[in-house]
């Protein structure tokens, strides 16, 4: 943790940088300001981290009018506001709220530091046709494993935009044989849980929209 102080134009600024995610409660008493840093779970029943995929120089899929990174961010912010409005006992934390590139490792770290109950990463599909309507769900499993693998490898290519990504990700290289083997071993993890959650989300999504 670090504390930075600055005074300019008659205003004092104190910046506190913490290595964990906290909620802050402020109390004033005379000339003193007291700050209490509390874990989100001390205030909320559940903590949800919403991750808007891509960002910054990584545009994701690019269409004639829109970039995936911008749609992801818009959906993430709308989704977060909806959760806050309907479920006040749930704390919403975003990996990004502006057009910036957040390293993949940092996205996971944010969720881990907050001890999140659920991590939701939002991405948008691309399609050559303008008429498709519906939902696609990708789950790492044994069926159509190679197609799932291609999606995972492509999404993780974003790390090439990061400085010193080879060291940060312990030698991981997008597209390499070693990385392919690693993903093959990892794709079975949480398969059942992923399928159940995806099924519930898809049914709710289709049931509350005009999509087929």
Regions found by a protein language model. Give the residues of each.
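Signal-peptide-cleaved, periplasmic/extracellular N-terminal interaction regions immediately downstream
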Residues: 1-48, 67, 71-74, 85
């Amino acid at each position: 943790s670090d504390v930075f102080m600055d005074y300019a134009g008659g205003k004092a600024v104190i910046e506190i940088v913490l290595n964990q995610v906290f909620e802050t409660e402020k109390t004033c008493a005379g000339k003193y300001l007291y700050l209490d840093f509390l874990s989100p779970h001390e205030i909320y029943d559940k903590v949800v981290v919403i991750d808007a995929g891509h960002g910054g120089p990584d545009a994701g899929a690019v269409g004639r009018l829109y970039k995936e990174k911008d749609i992801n961010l818009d959906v993430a912010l709308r989704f977060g506001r909806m959760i806050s409005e309907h479920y006040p006992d749930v704390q919403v934390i975003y990996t990004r709220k502006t057009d910036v590139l957040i390293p993949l490792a940092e996205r996971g770290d944010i969720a881990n530091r907050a001890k999140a109950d659920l991590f939701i990463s939002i991405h948008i599909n691309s399609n050559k046709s303008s008429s498709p309507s519906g939902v696609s769900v990708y789950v790492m499993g044994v069926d159509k494993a190679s197609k799932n693998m291609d999606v995972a490898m492509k999404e993780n290519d974003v790390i090439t935009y990061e400085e010193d990504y080879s060291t940060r990700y312990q030698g991981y290289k997008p597209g390499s044989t070693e990385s392919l083997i690693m993903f093959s071993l990892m794709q079975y993890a949480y398969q059942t849980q992923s399928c159940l959650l995806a099924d519930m989300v898809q049914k709710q999504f289709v049931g509350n929209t005009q999509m087929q």
